[in-house]
Amino acid sequence: MPHRASLSIHPRRTLDFSRISFFFSSLRSLRLCDLCVNSFSVFFLFLALAEVSLSGCSSRNPSDPSSLTFLIESSPTNLDPRFATDSQSQRIDGLLFSGLLERDNQMNFHGDLAESWSTPDPLTYVFHLRHGVRFHDGRALTVTDVKATFEFIMNPANKSPKRGALRMVNSIETPDEATVIFHLSQPFASFSLNLIPSAIGIVPANAGADFSRHPIGSGPFRFVQQSQDEEVVVERSPEYFRDAPRIPRVRFRVVPDGVVRALELRKGSADLEMSSLSPDIIPVLARQPDLAVTDRPGTNLTYLGFNLEDPVLSHREVRQALALATDREALIRYLLHGQAKLAAGVLPPDHWAAEPNVAPYPYDPARAEQLLDAAGFPRKQDGVRLQLTLKCSTEEQARLIGAALQEQWRRVGIQLELRPLELATLFSDVAKGNFQITYQRWVGANTDPDFFEYAFSSKRFPPEGANRGHYRNSRIDALTDQIRVEMNQEKRKALCSEVQKILADDLPYLPMWFNDVVSVHRRSLGTLELPSTGNYNFLATLHASGN
């Protein structure tokens, strides 16, 4: 059902003109196009009103006060963990399924389905399963299910996008009812990362082709229903082998429009959102007595991806010029309101393998013009050097960033066309190579050095991986292969350092920033223990009192 909102202004309330003045000065400093200024100023004024009322928006069912309504921007595309690659699917899968291992907020691994595990040598991983674990349908989870899950992904006939992550697995052995042994063809330093619930959750051995329509896992929540582009409903599982979640039911309601998400929270018909609102709206909502804001530094990377098979973007000088023509600090300051940290590379700055001597590209439009001249793209009579197209999502912030890039790049002679697309279409186009530049975000995957191979190796073009820009560099291929098998962390770090220096020069991506994780939620939920990756696993221990 479409969400419609009508606005009424309380006659005794006034607007916060100081914030509005700051907002307009921010836009002027960025010199955004008039259309962007007009549309977003209306948006801001709309939410800056002291009193807002809605008509036609659904509200929480008062007969079910312990349920939680979580607003999300888009539907998960596939809840089968053998195929899920989009962030919404992986985050919800992390609640529905269990993995052999799990990872805490400090990125340390612990047993999940595995009660214990060992690596007697670099090619052998032995897992001993917990006793008494059951799927949500009551059937016992066995070593047969574990083996079948991984072998399904490894079978090329099934075309799982996760097959490449397991290509070093030679065989899987189940010598008894509680033991699973993985035999690798060569050492794989990041193998454990593929064993957490959001990466590869264990499914029943008989899971068929329609499994994504009614997934059955063994995680803290069980699937109830999904209405595409409307909602996903989960409820706590009585079969869960650990302490049951305190929240009986979570309703992930799909509300694509940021205005409506904010108004739903303002009205009280939703309980929380996470990193889905325009940063300018958050202070307005934070002033509401029943709402609170919890935030923390995040690891999710926003980036510009370049298609290196494009005849223009295949020039390294052009990619470097685009980096120099982008005033990222201004974008963070004025459009993100400081809720992000400038990125120099794809690894978070406090990561053990991050290279400190790789610095972010500075804002230097004069140098950008020199590079464009040298690459053979002089200004024409109309002042335009190039015409490029940026594909992004339809969310407000993406379109606003795109409009700012239009203006910044115009100053160096680049005419940028924006093409906002629904997420499913955007992901499909990018995977097919049907793009020049894309504005996207990496969620979670960039917290391990194995990401370099997954995103930049020439062996990892889709569907085998995420090298969507078809970047080719034989040295990167060799280094990322070594990173995957090197078990010594200091040696691995040295390999990662060289990779980061090459990527900073070649620039197949322009790392923009690491977004803070920010949640607007009902104050009665308390301070949320938000993970830096933005996952939803905190819901398993959240208390829903005061609904």
Segment roles from a protein language model:
Residues R236, S314-E407, R472, L479, ...:
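Append "and occasionally in soluble cytosolic enzymes with long acidic Gly/Pro-rich linkers
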Residues S519-N547:
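Long beta-strand-rich cores associated with HINT superfamily self-processing modules
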Residues R60, Q228, A375-G444, Q489, ...:
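Ligand/substrate-recognition segments at binding pockets and active sites
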Residues I72-D121, E151, H214-S218:
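N-terminal lobe/hinge region of extracytoplasmic solute-binding protein
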Residues N108, P187, L193-P245, R249, ...:
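Gly/Pro-rich hinge or "lid" segments in bacterial periplasmic/extracellular proteins
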Residues S118, V126-H128, K162-P204:
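Surface-exposed binding/hinge segments that line
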